Amino acid sequence: MIKQRTLKNEIRATGVGLHTGQKVYLTLLPAPVDAGIVFRRVDLNPVVEIPAKAANVGDTTLSTTLIQDGVRVSTVEHLLSAMAGLGIDNAIIEVSADEVPIMDGSAGPFVFLIQSAGIVEQNAAKKFIRIKKPITVQDGDKSASFLPFEGFKVSFTIDFDHPVFRGRKLDATVDFSSTSFVKEVSRARTFGFMHEIEYLRSKGLAKGGSVDNAIVVDKFRILNEDGLRYEDEFVKHKILDAIGDLYLLGTSLIGEYKAYKSGHGLNNKSLLELIKQEDAWEMVTFEDDEVAPISYIKPLLAV
């Protein structure tokens, strides 16, 4: 049986919020079977819990923000991407502010935290949503589709009219039956344009943003001294974001997600459309590991 997973131990980290620039304390804790991923604002009294579900997405400007009764947790996508990539079904995420720390702008530090905490299987079947028929959502020239596929695959195309992107690979497909999330996707950093960062700062945002936690691009070039971590790091980060946004389904996905110029808004819009069209998917579990289209390496190997 493919079983649900949680963390073995509690683990803590600190970082800065991308927008506030303030120090944020982060704690990842184990959670019981079927709890899902739940964010907990421990700086509030009483403490507020927000389940990581698509219906709780209240803002997709610049990042994915969960909102419940006016309480927010922003920039959840990179941490959720790490949870999805390592197959964590149940966890409590405590934060001391209204945003998850940006760390280095990728999911890499979160992968390291989860692996350091350890991963344990729980005595219940892992749930998957399997796509049965195609669904496409358009937004102007942008599009996002869910397609039937026996496995999990994300295909993404970006399009920027900018010198840095000319001659670069602007599309990528990652089939997770043959590609390691940890090695090939998790280290891709978020990117931003200098003029946008300056504008955001004038509005009191992006105070924590720097070359330490993003790929920063000016009119002509990449400003980071060390350059890129992958040749196709830009589009790989979009795939990383999509994996995190899709994990707001509350389960792992069996199917393909194909996106053209999509962002957090369209990722969420397509997810809500999928949930609404109940004949387009089915919930499945696997009693027999051998017949499962997605193989999850035994947790011990992930440590």
From Swiss-Prot:
Q: Which reaction does it catalyse?
A: a UDP-3-O-[(3R)-3-hydroxyacyl]-N-acetyl-alpha-D-glucosamine + H2O = a UDP-3-O-[(3R)-3-hydroxyacyl]-alpha-D-glucosamine + acetate
Q: Which cofactor does it need?
A: Zn(2+)
InterPro entries per the UniProt record, alphabetical:
Ribosomal_Su5_D2-typ_SF, UDP-acyl_GlcNac_deAcase, UDP-acyl_GlcNac_deAcase_C, UDP-acyl_N-AcGlcN_deAcase_N
> Pfam family of this protein, just one?
LpxC
Q: What is its EC number?
A: 3.5.1.108
Q: What is the enzyme's main class?
A: hydrolase
- Please list the GO terms describing molecular function: metal ion binding; UDP-3-O-acyl-N-acetylglucosamine deacetylase activity
On the tree of life, the source organism's domain of life is Bacteria
Summarizing the function annotation, the protein's role is: Catalyzes the hydrolysis of UDP-3-O-myristoyl-N-acetylglucosamine to form UDP-3-O-myristoylglucosamine and acetate, the committed step in lipid A biosynthesis.
Q: Return the protein name.
A: UDP-3-O-acyl-N-acetylglucosamine deacetylase
The organism is Saccharophagus degradans (strain 2-40 / ATCC 43961 / DSM 17024)
Its taxonomic path starts at: Bacteria, Pseudomonadati, Pseudomonadota, Gammaproteobacteria, Cellvibrionales
